[in-house]
């Protein structure tokens, strides 16, 4: 067998191992949603558009990350 073929096969083997490892280590797991629903919140027209959370688990305790206008904030959950 020619040396360049062996080199090519070895390179493909290494590359396939690296790709398989990259796929398994980079899987994202989204956090679970906390129980309850976001409360209905009335907001004033000049309410600031600040992002205080993205997921429920960004909030302390049992609070949920709820949309408030163009923002998201942590609130105690409402009833199911």
Curated annotation (Swiss-Prot):
Entry's localization field: Secreted
One family name in Pfam for this protein: WAP
Matches recorded under SUPFAM superfamilies: Elafin-like
Record keywords: Antibiotic, Antimicrobial, Disulfide bond, Secreted, Signal
GO cellular component: extracellular region; extracellular space
SMART domains named among the record's database cross-references: WAP
Ranges for domain WAP: 31-78
Signal peptide: 1-22
Covalent S-S links between cysteines: 38-66, 49-70, 53-65, 59-74
Keyword Secreted recorded: yes
Listed GO MF terms: serine-type endopeptidase inhibitor activity
UniProt tissue specificity: Expressed by the venom gland.
UniProt xrefs under InterPro entries: Elafin-like_sf, WAP_dom, WAP_four-disulfide_core
Sections of the chain in a coiled coil: none
Protein's GO biological process: defense response to bacterium; venom-mediated disruption of cell wall in another organism
Family: Belongs to the venom waprin family.
Job description of the protein: Damages membranes of susceptible bacteria. Has no hemolytic activity. Not toxic to mice. Does not inhibit the proteinases elastase and cathepsin G.
The protein's name: Waprin-Phi3
Native source organism of the sequence: Philodryas olfersii (Green snake)
């Amino acid at each position: 067998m020619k040396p360049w073929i062996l080199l090519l096969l070895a390179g493909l083997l290494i590359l396939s191992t690296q790709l398989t490892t990259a796929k398994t280590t980079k899987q994202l797991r989204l956090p679970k949603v906390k129980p309850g629903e976001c409360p209905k919140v009335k907001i004033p027209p000049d309410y600031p558009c600040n992002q205080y959370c993205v997921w429920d688990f960004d909030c302390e305790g049992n609070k949920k990350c709820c949309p408030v206008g163009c923002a998201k904030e942590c609130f105690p959950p409402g009833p199911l």
